[in-house]
Amino acid sequence: MSLVDRAGVGAAAWVVTSAVFSVPLVAWGLWRPSVALPVLLVAVAVAVRVARSVPCVAGPRWAAISLVLVAVAGGVWAGATHAEHIVLRRDAGTYALSAQHLATAHRLGVDVDVPALGGAAALATAGVTVASPGFYARGSGARTRVVPQFLPATPVLLSLGWWADGWTGLLLAPAVGLALALLAFGALARRLVGPAWAVAATAALALTQPVLHAGRATYSEPFALLVGCAAASVLVAATSRSLEDRALRRLGLLAGLLAGGVALVRIDALRESALLLPVVALLAARRSPTARPLLAGLGLATVYAFATALLVSRPYLGAVAGSLLPLAAAVVVLAGGSAVALRVRRWPRALVVRLPLVLAVATLLGFAVLASRPLWLVVRQSAADPGARVVAGLQLAQGLAVDGGRTYDEETVGWTAWWVGVPALLLALAAAVLLAHRLGVALRDGAALPAWLAPAIVGVASTALTLYRPGITPDHPWADRRLVPVVLPTVLLLAAAAVRHLTARAATAPSPHSAPDGTAEPHRVARVRSRTPVGGVVAGVVGLGLLAGPAAAATWPVAGQRTERGEVAAVDQACAALRPGDTAVLVDDRAANEWPQVLRGVCGVPSVVVRSRAGTPGTAAVRTVVAGVRAAGRRPVLVSAGSAAALEQLGASARQVVDLRTTEDQRLLTRRPGGSASLDVDLWLGPVSSGPS
């Protein structure tokens, strides 16, 4: 079925094309249906043309239909249990609010009505800001504005859901992305492990809680998974030896554009772009027609993605510079090393002869080092980092030794094993070691490069780097989404390859009546044939259990969990309690962290934060802002999300307008999550009739 092999690639091409076209529209404030929809239709035409150029994989019809059903079921499951994370606490809230603002204001940047906030003098007061988590303040004085944290591709895609059906459409968009991502992963798996085992691998991926969690809330991971898997699938096709050179060049260019285009969704995808450079070098060394187009597409898309980040997300780049600088260094080192390798005509014979063993042992040792780190290493960051205070609070609440500087990076192999199981992890390791050895043999003997070259090198290396340094607050299940774009797909593909190999061996195992070389004696052929299918079936059932069983068991406790239910209604209540001419002055820490963009972007009420000191609202700063708001002819409304006391201390009469009891995901540091935690969402308003005391 061509649909299975081409739908994911077409969807990924549409995502990347739409993201490319949207950047100037978003920057110029033109992202509105009347302009965007024609552009998106052009992107559809491009995607259809691109998808038709991708060769299909032969296979039984039942396998293709099963794969589609698995992908649809995964998307429906995520959609039926979707979160309503709007009141901002984590990245999902940032994406949701950015997308809502983009859909309604037609640009990512948030304009700030400086006079309505008390004027430039009030904003210059110590402790007064328009910034909040996920939204940076840019400029000063009358030119102050707010910039969302992340790259524009995900908000652009989510904004389409808003245009379709408001909050419901926006919150369901990631589930649609997840279904397409599973289809793209399945298409990649069909090329690597065959149509039948592709169904098992895709089902296992859909069952893992981190993947389900990413599809339930407004995260970028489903779209990154979609484009990344499609890029890998096209690249496998581009290294096929059954196509003519012109087709291989076309597929190589497409693979490069898609691979580089992932960085339009997630900036850390620059890591995978860098890791493709050695692949390009190997292809070039074998004079593959794919090499140059692949490099051209990769370079073009990566440069465009980085330029986009500089244009619309510059503050975010500064915030993650500690992660980006090593990536930039890796690009330079890998590019330089690849160029040097291409110029070396003769490698030392001792190295060439032992290359298969060297690569296999290096793979095994790399895993051993990563997996053993909890025995001999505790990874820490600066205790002054804002994340360290969060970790310290979680440690205290969970009865752990308080050490806020811990990142728990050394535990990442364990995180992965939580969701796929130790057997699948060991199967993946065995497959990775075997593939490393086979690659060494191909390089040593000058044989043709295998089609799995690029996914194996990039997938294994990126998995190792992600596990080495995940770069995320280590509470679960939130931190586990770092495993979604590359780690879990790579592990499950390798495990599926190992199971397929073992199943094939079981199905063709020599009987007691085989000849010494393992072939069946002629007069025993019928008897051998009657036995071998049983071994294959048993091995297949066991393999399927090893792939999907642990994932299903780990996810089962949270399979039907819906978090943040009621937040859409809570936001509506907050907006209804405010009126035209109001200016929201947020005076406690929780209000300052969770509500500024909700009130500013969703309710349309100018909002300013007055940071408290030691838990006490800054009275002098509040007085300055209130006076400036009044001078502008507006009504200042003090806002608290922690308690009414913060408003009463300032002389305002507090009225609770939001009183929601809901749930959120657990925030565990050392255990696999298996449930939800209670969450209170409150909001008090205090209109100021006279100056605060």
Across the structure, where does each feature detected by a protein language model lie?
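Transmembrane-helix signature of polytopic, membrane-embedded enzymes
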Residues: 185-207, 226, 244-252, 457-460, ...
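Membrane-interface alpha helices of multi-pass inner-membrane proteins
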Residues: 26, 188, 201-203, 250-267, ...
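Short acidic/glycine- and proline-prone juxtamembrane loop motifs at membrane-interface regions
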Residues: 210-223, 268
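Membrane-embedded, hydrophobic transmembrane alpha-helices
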Residues: 1-63, 248, 286-433, 437, ...
